[in-house]
Amino acid sequence: MIERLILFNFQSDKNTKHTRVRNMLLRRAAAALPARKTPLHCYRRLGGSYRALSGSLLLRDEEKRLPHRVQDERDEAKADTDLAADGDSAATKPWYLNIVERPAQNMPLHQQEIVFPANSPKSLETIATFLRDKLGLSDVLIFDLRDSQDEQVTAASKISDFMVMATAKSGRHGHKSFIELNTLLKQEFKTVGQVEGNISANELRRRQKRLARHTNLSKSMGSRTATTRSGSNLESWYMIDCRLDNIFVNILTENKRQDLNLEELYAPPDQKHLYRREAPAEDVAPKEGDDNVLAGLKRLAARNQRRYFTTVPARVQIIDALSRQDFDLVLNVVSASKMDSLDILKAANQTLRSMPYGVKIEGESWITFLDEVWPLAPYSQDFWSTRLELFKLLNCAAPGQVNVDRVFTGYLKFKLASGESLTKSDLVEFLQLVETNLSENSHVDYEDLVAKNKCVLEALKLYKGLDPRLILDSEVMCLLLSTLSITQSGSTSTLRAFYEMVEFASREFSQEPPVPVTATVLRILADKQDYARILRFWEKSIASSPEKDHRPWPLFLDTVASTGDQEFAKKVIRDGHLLWIKRNGVKASPELREAIERLFAVADPAEVAFKDVKEFLTVE
């Protein structure tokens, strides 16, 4: 029995030292058991003879066992030495401290590389590395919201500089992660973060009970939210304000991150398409050969799926589609959204202004789109100003498709046909557009000048029954005079209507012509080098009373001097045109003296021929 017990205790031990101890114990047990056997009851009566016999027998047994005993003593001494050595090593280092270092597992989690923004603080690197290496969060992304160029400004870009996104394996993992992150902030940076989305178990049960009391509300909200035993949601989202360098951390479960798609919201405008999700394909009707039961299950599963939605505003989608001139997509977005027509028109104007140089503009398609989104009854002037601006942009980007005639038809005639009254600003904007087309186009010729003036004449006819005196406005008259002439290769060409307008202006403003009208006439005649008409126009406006000569003399003298023609300047002096300054008592202002100096510098650079006249005019 003892031998079995010894073998049972040492059966799984492979240590050599322990094997010696086991063998020694077995030999001792085998030697001790025969010696301890009790003699029979019959031999006890023999007395001394028995003791002598037993002594002799024991002596013989001892002689036989003497070699074995010596070997046992040697084994015992060696076993004691081994046990003492084991005891010393165990005393210095306990067995539970012998921990084997496991090699680091080569998992994809440790291979993920985090891209940090330029000039990011050291704290951001510490937090992002802690999320990846210590907490085991995956798909760590960092968005730089400093100097965001996104047209759709969000609250996150106003209060944060860096937005960190990370994925947790479960709701409990996310719950534990934000606790560990808060601990890091306390220990390393001496700050305490603020978390949103951490709903306790009691609060969650309270909400579920509230929903259960209202049956209809509970049905509309769907099934109860799945929670773990610790009270954390299976699908959760924790947003932590680190209160450190404007860093915000979002910890989401995988399904929650896919549903919210926050990357599209925080990404720069040129990277939003990388995170944009496509709309799910529409269900295909089952064929006749399909199993109706399976088809019904498919439809039921599709109906119970979460509805697709996007975080991109409709305005941003419209601008993106218009920049690619995908008008079908724009109309689909417009029909699906509830944007106001005015906002859509402003988005179109903004897109045209930001179009890169060299992109071919489809002018007719833009006008068709404008007519599609135009409201039936515009109630404010903003609609018409936005429409006019759109036509002006199209004329600038595609003058071959949207010319002056197209603008006249699409805006002036369209507005009048819609029951709206034309205003002075409408005519001024149209005349400025015509003048720009004539002055900035280097390939315009006399025929183009005639064609554009026919369009101007049609525009004036629209105002004939509205405000006939509008043509006498100085701003309108200056623009009309500018549209009647063109300058090509240093030479100016004018229509006959220009001289008729000059005669009309001289007749209507015989007493005090407006200064802008006078300046426009003098400029065009000087460019044309029609000096005789310059003097004729200037003399027609001489007042009969000396006290009423309010003509812009500095302007007239500067016009003569700017021609650089010495003979023309001498003619003005010799013919006595400057003497009207003294005759009519025109005040010699500093501007007038400077104009006289410039004129005499052109006519008499040596100051010999007209020195007396110059002194007479400049002396008060």
Curated annotation (Swiss-Prot):
Main location group = mitochondrion
Where in the cell?
A: Mitochondrion inner membrane
Please give the name of this protein.
ATPase synthesis protein 25, mitochondrial
State the superkingdom: Eukaryota
Topology in membrane: Peripheral membrane protein
Give the Gene3D superfamilies listed for this entry: Beta Polymerase, domain 2 (3.30.460.10)
Q: Which SUPFAM superfamilies match?
A: Nucleotidyltransferase
For region Disordered, the annotated ranges are 66-85
Say which species the protein is native to: Lachancea thermotolerans (strain ATCC 56472 / CBS 6340 / NRRL Y-8284) (Yeast)
What keyword terms does UniProt attach to this protein? Membrane, Mitochondrion, Mitochondrion inner membrane, Transit peptide
**Which GO BP annotation is one of this protein's?**
mitochondrial gene expression
Instruction: Give the InterPro entries listed for this entry.
Output: Atp25, ATP25_mRNA_stabil_dom, NT_sf
Q: Where is the composition biased (Basic and acidic residues)?
A: 66-81
Q: What does this protein do?
A: Probable mitochondrial mRNA stabilization factor.
Q: Name one GO cellular component term.
A: mitochondrial inner membrane
UniProt similarity note = Belongs to the ATP25 family.
Q: Which Pfam families match?
A: mRNA_stabil, RsfS
Return the PANTHER family for the record.
Answer: ATPASE SYNTHESIS PROTEIN 25, MITOCHONDRIAL
